[in-house]
Design a protein with these regions (language model features):
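A structural boundary signal for the start of the first folded domain, especially the loop/turn
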Residues: 1-83, 88-165
C-alpha cells in the first residue's frame, strides 16, 4: 500500500536544509541516533524490516520515487517480503510509507492510513523526528501482528537511515 502526504516544515528546518544541503543533515546526530534506535526496537518485535530514507526532493510523484528507492535498498529481497520504507523528501515536504508485497497480501487496503495521519500530526507541530519515530513504532506494532519474530529471525537489512547521494 502506498501513501504519501505533504507536511509543513518550520523555519528552523528550512534554514537547516538551506545551509546543510545533504539530506542526512536534516536531522541532528542525536535525532539520527534516536531514529535508528526506534528501528532496532521495532524490529525486535517482528520479523519485518523497517528503513527510513531521506531525499532532498522527489523530483516526481513521491510514491514513484519511494518505489525505486525501495528496490535500490534491496527491500524486495527479504525472506517474507515484509519490509516497510518511510520515504521523506525534505525540500518537497512529502513522505510515503511503502510496504512490500508480503505485507499487502494479508492486510486491508488502508492499512497505513492511521500511521500516516499520526506522523502528519507530528510534522504539523514541527516534530519531524518524533513523527518518524512514532511512525516506526506504529509500523513495528502493526507488523508484529502478521509477522511475529521467528525463531531463526535475523536482521536482513541495515538499521540505518539511508539518503540520496
Amino acid at each position: 500500500m502506498l501513501r504519501y502526504q505533504i507536511f509543513p516544515l518550520s523555519v528552523s528546518h528550512i534554514k537547516n536544509m538551506f545551509f546543510k544541503k545533504h539530506p542526512k543533515k536534516f536531522f541532528s546526530p542525536e535525532e539520527q541516533e534516536r531514529i535508528v534506535e526506534e528501528i532496532r526496537k521495532a524490529e525486535d518485535r517482528t520479523s519485518g524490516e523497517i528503513r527510513v530514507h531521506l531525499d532532498c526532493c522527489a523530483r516526481e510523484i513521491p510514491v514513484e520515487k519511494a518505489k525505486r528507492v525501495f528496490h535500490k535498498l534491496g527491500m524486495t529481497e527479504t525472506k517474507a517480503r515484509n519490509g516497510v520504507l518511510i520515504y521523506l523528501a525534505t525540500e518537497d515536504r512529502k513522505f510515503a510509507i511503502l510496504g512490500d508485497e508480503g505485507i499487502h497480501r494479508v492486510v486491508p487496503e488502508n492499512y497505513w492510513e492511521d500511521v500516516k495521519e499520526k506522523m502528519q500530526k507530528q510534522f504539523r507541530e514541527d516534530r519531524v523526528c518524533e513523527g518518524i519515530c512514532l511512525g516506526i513504532r506504529e509500523i513495528g506494532e502493526k507488523l508484529k501482528t502478521y509477522f511475529p519474530v521467528e525463531k531463526d529471525d535475523r536482521n536482513e537489512l541495515p538499521d540505518t537511515i539511508s539518503e540520496e547521494k
